[in-house]
Amino acid sequence: LIVDIAKKQNPAVVFVTSKKKFQPARGNLPQQRKPFRQPSPFGQPGPFGSPSPSPQQPGPGNGTGTGFLIDKDGYILTNNHVVDNADVIKITLDNEKEYEAELIGSDSKTDIALLKIMRQPGDNTNFPYLELGDSKKVEVGEWVVAIGNPFGLDHTVTTGVVSAKARNIGAGPYDEYIQTDASINPGNSGGPLLDMEGKVIGINTAIYSRTGGNVGIGFTIPINMASDILDELKKDGKVTRGWLG
């Protein structure tokens, strides 16, 4: 079953590379004291707290991560921290074909970004894509599959189970992470977590680790959270929320 899922869904998972003209210098907080208050182990500022402010340093900076196609027209979901402040975003498909991508919309509060592949004139490719599932139906203990690009090793497939639901890790007001022991590492960020039907149930986002490597505790944004804001990201490029005042 897992072999079938990997063969069928791998072509819809993409390698995301972001290039920045300026890369912020970031300091690391002591990992032993505050393992949740360190820069994200995925190599970009992630949901485990904000690094200490520091001036911009001249010079190029590159970020890498994962994304996945959600329709035949080339829309891609990934993490906001993978492409945040990027000047150029490049997508590499399973067949090694490269495209530039446009940032359609992003939401830092949920760490979700929507990209779209920029086609050349006359390119009518129907891209392979993943079907979005229902994360409300996810059960603790069910098997899951993660696909991503850990350490640049593209289209790596790992398996595990759902370890917990609605996990709060102190990242913000939208903490409802799915916890999994499927192996995810730097470069997996933005990739899909799939159920045994091959449907996306979450976006792999972060890990708990004192070393920066996988220890079997990964966190995934429930896909329903992305589905809820998808239309708004397409239309407005951002999410507008109400407030009391």
Go through the PLM ranges and name each one.
Residues L1-G245:
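Serine-dependent protease modules
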